[in-house]
């Protein structure tokens, strides 16, 4: 997702953080709670805190925010209101550097969320167990003991998710990358990942 940012005035009420805030538009990120990864969207941030849009209830545990360029920040939840939550950074951050680095096309990449889930694939008319390792809007990573060929068509079955038709896009046996024939919208991906991580909807 592309992002834009604008400086805003002090936030009212529970969102007041003192430092100058920047409104961030369409910047996806990962919320990491006790090692489990969830999709979120940055809404505004300052040197001392950040407001996130969530797609599920707030998870419990020690938390970090990971941006698409790989930067990670330890955060602490301060409030939650519907599908938005406010967090405080464990230490102040350089907001301008953070945003400018995130806008660098060489640093920007699609959010890929790590999961660990048993699944099955159907290939060449046969069903085989696999291990799902990550999920994005347009693909997945799996571990499969059966050799797969690049560009081979497969069907991936994961718990309550819909059937996923995909092609093998890279092979490093036993690890393989799949690209879906039809991808997910942001909200769909967030919901599926939260369910796979054992987190109910908000």
Task: Report the location of each language-model feature.
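Structured alpha-helical
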Residues: 1-202
